[in-house]
Every structure is written in C-alpha cells, then in structure tokens.
C-alpha cells in the first residue's frame, strides 16, 4: 500500500513539510510493522512505484485510521492472548484444586470408611461385651441357683446325718445291751462247759484235748438250745393257731361256713405237715453230720491214749529232773546220750500225737477218715498195750498220692482253660512251689464265670468271628501285626476327632446347625467359593473392562512395550525441567512456551 503523495508545489516550505510528514508517516508504519512482527504477522512494506495499477492508494486520514485500527487490533489480540493465558492458568489451577479436592474427598471417604469399619468393630465389640456380660450374669445366676440347691441338699444331708447319728446312738445303746447279754451268755456258757466237763471227766480242763472237748460240748449245747427255742416257738405257734381255729369254728354260724373253715384248716395243716417234714429232714441231716457212737468210742480211746502218753511224759520229765538234781556234777557220757535220746523220743511222740489228732479231726475229709478207720480198728488191741502209730503210715501215703495227683489235675485244668478261655493269662506255676487248691478253684471259677456269661449273653460272637473282625481291621488299615492294632486304632480315633472338630468349627463359622449333615456343609462351602470366584471375576472385569481375554493379553503386551520408553521419557523431562513431580511437567512446558514468545 502506498499513501497518496501531495501534489508538488513550487515553494520549498511545502516540500519540506511534505518530507517531514512522509518521514513521520513511515516511522509510524515502521512501528506498526514492529507490532505486527511481534505478534507473528508479516510486516507492511512501503514501495515506491510509478505504476499505479497494482496499488491501492489511501489518503492520510484513511492511512491514519488504518494504523489506528491495526494498533487496536494488535493490542486487542495481545490483550486476548493475555486473557487466554490467564484463563489457561486459572483452568490449570482449578484442575489442580479439583484434583486436590478429589484426593481430599477420596481421603475423607477412605477415612469415613475406616471410621465406619471402626464403628462396626466397636459395635461388634460392644455386642460381644454385652453378650459376655449377659453370659456372666446368667452364669452367676446359675451359680447362685446351684449354691442354693447345694445349700438345700446340705441341709437335707445335715438332717439325715443327725437322724443317722441318733440311730447310731440307739444302735450303740442296743449293741451295748447286746454285749452285756452276750457277756452273760458267755459266762453262762463257760459255766455250763466246765460243769459238763467236770460231770464227764471228774476234773478241771487243762490240755488241748480238753479244750477241743469243751468246744464240742459248746457246739452240742448250742444245738440243744437252738432246738429248744425252735420247739418253744413252734409250740407257741401251734397253740395260737389252735386258738384261732377254735375261734373260727365258734364264729362260723352255718354249715357252709364250717366246711370252709375246715377246708382252710386242712390246707393249713398240710402246710404245717410239709414244714414239719422239711424240719424233720433238716434234723436228720443234722443228725447224720453228728458223730456216731463208734466215733465217740474212738474219741474216748484217743483221750485215753493221750492221757497215758501224758502220764509217760510226766514220768519222763520227773526222771530227767530227778537225775539232773542228783547228778549235777557227775554226768557220764551214756547218761547224756540216754537223756538226749529220751528228749528226741519225746519230741517224736508229740509229733505223732499231733498227726494222729489231725487225722482223726472231724474237719478231715470223709474218704481219708473212712480209709483210716480200718487201720484204727486193726490196731486197737496194740494201742492199749504200746500206743502204736502204725495206722498213720497208709493215711500219710494216701495224702502224698493225692498231693502228687494235684499236679496232673492242675495240668488238665490248665489245658481246659486254654481251650475255653484262651484270653485269660494264667501265671506260670513255679516248680519249687507246691500246687495249692486255691489256684485250682480260681481256674474253675474263671471257667464257670465265662460259661455263665456266655449263657447270659448268647448274642456274643464266638472266637472265629472276633478273629475275622481283627483280620479285616488289619487289611482295612494296613496293619501287619496284632501289636500295631491299638496304635492304628488310636491314630484313627485322633484323626476322627480332628475331623469332627474341623466340621464343628466350619458349622460355627458358617452359622449352621450342629445337627446338619456333611452334605449340607459341603454344599454351603461350595456356594461360598462360587460367590468368591464371581466377586473376583467382577473385580477383574471392572479393572480391565468388558473385553475378551485375547484383547486383555494384547493390552498387557502393549503396556509392557510402551511403559519402559514412557518411563525413560518422563525421567528425562524431570531431569531437564528440574522438577520432582509428574503433575508439574505440563505447567513447566507452558511457562517455557510463554517465555519463548
């Protein structure tokens, strides 16, 4: 663009003024070009041309207006740029503030969630404490009730013990009276014993045989007293029954009543006859157990023999004492030998007398006694003369045979018990120890108990069934020997207990009833696992989006390829811009852009 040049005038002043105006106008256009260049626009050039076809000519006013308009536009654009820059900065600040507020809101939300969790935990703890306090209160109430019950039971026991003490005191008093009565009876018994013995033997008892005879007298006296009491009791009963019968007969007004009473009397008389017959049988048995006349004769003969032996013993003692008194200093060797022999003979005689008394004791077995009777009868004539003890030899031999046969009996019983009751471990008999009858009785009693138990419990399995059960257990649980059965059973029981504890814990955690079956427990655990897997899948879908697995794999591969380069680029930017935060990269770049302008 070229401004319209004023027409040339003749005067020099006009030319100078025009030149100055031209220079001033060019300077203004230069200043405008500077402004345009500062704003990134191309400058305007003032061209001096003579050809006016391609030119547009403005006058001074229009050029001045143009300059003003350009200045205004440039100023307006600069102002708008400043405003835009301020808006960008304010927008960035607002974004930063929004991020801060969002982070604060997230923190507040997280804090609120934490507080809610804390509040829920506090509520649960409060509920637990309330439950514990209620349980403690219930336990205390139950304890109070139990203590009250115990107090009542103790009071009842105290009353019972008081009653028992009074009863014991009464029993003590009655026992004291009974003791007094028994003491009197014992004194009477001793008096009667001595009286009967003095009547029979015409002397005072002072030997062992005398004491045995006193015991025998006491036994028969007690039997006689018992029979007297029973007889008196039966006579009293018969008298009372006869009186009742007479009363019944007197009370029966009619013939029918008389017949009924007679029938009743016949029944009662039959029962009495039966009772009397049973008593008769008992008395006959008692009489059979009593010694016979022959036995009494034997006892008398033994008493006579013992008296003779006692007299001989007394004479020997007198002779020995007399010889000791006479020959205290003068003792020859033959006299010493005779005295020792006499003492040995005396001891032998005492031993044989004791053996004879044992053999003829009523407590001796019947077979032994019967076998020894013949020998005693054969030696009666000699006993009167020289008091021989030849009849003791066969008896002692028979006893030895019986004792030796006990070993065979023990062996046979042992084999029988091994067949019948093999689970009873009988202790081994020592060869040095003798076989006792108590051991044989113990074996027989054990076998009888087993037989009785088998008869009572017929449903009990036999030995073969039990053996089959044990072998099946060994095969089932892989136990090679019987010694490993009990440890394996303990292991099975411990595993079973652990499984029961685990099932009980799962039932408590899943809030199931204790009576629920294992199928219900397994189904609930399966449902819970299914729900957990579904929640995990939903969380993965929320993170990765609703895409298929192949696209997720591609995204992960792209991320693995892109992330190292992006991380290196951001590290370089942080080093160049000398900042530490990623959020400060964009504001720093904008500042550099503004500074470059």
Swiss-Prot record:
Its main location: cytoplasm. Residues 1-23 are annotated as: Disordered. Keywords: Coiled coil, Cytoplasm, Cytoskeleton, TPR repeat. It is found in: Cytoplasm, Cytoskeleton, Microtubule organizing center, Centrosome. One of its GO terms (biological process) is cilium assembly. GO terms for cellular component: centrosome; cytoplasm. One of its GO terms (molecular function) is gamma-tubulin binding. PROSITE patterns: TPR, TPR_REGION. TPR repeats lie at residues 483-516. Residues 66-179, 254-326 form a coiled coil. The keyword Ribosomal protein does not apply. Plays a role in the organization of both preexisting and nascent microtubules in interphase cells. During mitosis, required for the organization and orientation of the mitotic spindle. The coiled-coil domains may be important for tubulin-gamma-binding and hence for centrosomal localization. Directly interacts with tubulin-gamma; this interaction determines centrosomal localization. This is Centrosomal protein of 70 kDa. It comes from Pongo abelii.
């Amino acid at each position: 663009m070229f401004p319209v040049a004023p027409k040339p005038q003749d005067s020099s002043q006009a030319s100078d003024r025009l030149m100055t105006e031209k220079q001033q106008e060019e300077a203004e256009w230069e200043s405008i070009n500077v402004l345009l260049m500062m704003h990134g626009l191309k400058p305007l050039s003032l061209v001096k041309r003579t050809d006016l076809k391609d030119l547009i000519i403005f006058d001074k006013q229009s050029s001045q207006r143009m300059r003003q308009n350009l200045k205004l536009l440039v100023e307006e654009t600069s102002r708008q740029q400043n405003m835009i820059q301020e808006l960008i900065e304010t927008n960035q600040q607002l974004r930063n503030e929004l991020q801060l507020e969002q982070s604060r809101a997230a923190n507040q939300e997280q804090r609120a969630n934490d507080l809610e969790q804390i509040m829920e935990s506090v509520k649960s703890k409060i509920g637990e404490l309330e439950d514990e306090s209620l349980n403690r209160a219930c336990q205390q109430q139950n304890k109070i009730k139990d203590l009250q019950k115990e107090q009542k039971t103790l009071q009842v026991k105290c009353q019972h013990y008081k009653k028992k003490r009074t009863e014991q005191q009464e029993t003590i008093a009655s026992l004291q009276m009974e003791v007094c009565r028994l003491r009197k009876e014992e004194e009477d018994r001793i008096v009667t014993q001595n009286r009967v013995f003095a009547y029979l033997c015409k002397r005072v008892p002072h030997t062992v045989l005398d004491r045995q005879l006193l015991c025998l007298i006491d036994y028969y006296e007690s039997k006689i007293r018992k029979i007297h009491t029973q007889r008196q009791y039966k006579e009293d009963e018969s008298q009372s029954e006869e009186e009742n019968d007479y009363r019944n007969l007197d009370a029966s007004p009619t013939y029918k009543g008389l017949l009924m009473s007679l029938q009743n009397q016949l029944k009662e008389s039959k029962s009495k006859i039966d009772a009397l017959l049973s008593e008769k049988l008992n008395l006959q048995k008692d009489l059979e157990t009593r010694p016979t006349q022959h036995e009494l004769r034997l006892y008398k003969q033994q008493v006579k023999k013992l008296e003779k032996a006692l007299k001989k013993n007394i004479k020997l003692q007198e002779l020995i004492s007399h010889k000791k008194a006479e020959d205290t200093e003068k003792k020859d060797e033959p006299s010493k030998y005779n005295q020792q022999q006499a003492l040995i003979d005396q001891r032998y005689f005492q031993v044989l007398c004791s053996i004879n008394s044992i053999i003829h004791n009523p407590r001796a077995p019947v077979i032994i006694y019967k076998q020894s009777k013949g020998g005693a009868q054969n030696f009666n004539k000699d006993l009167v003369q020289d008091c021989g003890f030849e009849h003791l030899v066969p008896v002692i031999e028979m006893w030895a045979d019986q004792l030796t046969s006990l070993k065979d009996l023990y062996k046979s019983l042992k084999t029988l018990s091994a067949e019948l009751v093999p689970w009873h471990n009988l202790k081994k008999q020592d060869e040095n120890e003798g076989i006792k009858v108590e051991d044989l009785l113990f074996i027989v009693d054990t076998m009888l108990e087993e037989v009785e138990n088998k008869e009572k419990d017929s449903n009990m399995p036999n030995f073969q069934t039990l053996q089959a059960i044990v072998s099946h257990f060994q095969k089932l649980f892989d136990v090679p020997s019987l010694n490993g059965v009990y440890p394996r059973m303990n292991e099975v029981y411990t595993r079973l207990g652990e499984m029961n504890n685990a099932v009980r814990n799962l039932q408590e955690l899943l809030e199931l009833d204790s009576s629920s079956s294992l199928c219900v427990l397994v189904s609930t655990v399966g449902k819970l696992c299914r729900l957990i897997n579904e929640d995990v899948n939903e969380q993965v879908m929320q993170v990765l989006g609703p895409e298929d697995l192949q696209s997720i794999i591609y995204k992960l591969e792209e991320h693995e390829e892109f992330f190292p380069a992006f991380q290196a680029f951001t590290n370089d930017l942080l080093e160049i811009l000398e900042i530490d935060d990623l959020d400060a990269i964009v504001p720093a770049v904008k500042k550099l852009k503004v500074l470059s302008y």
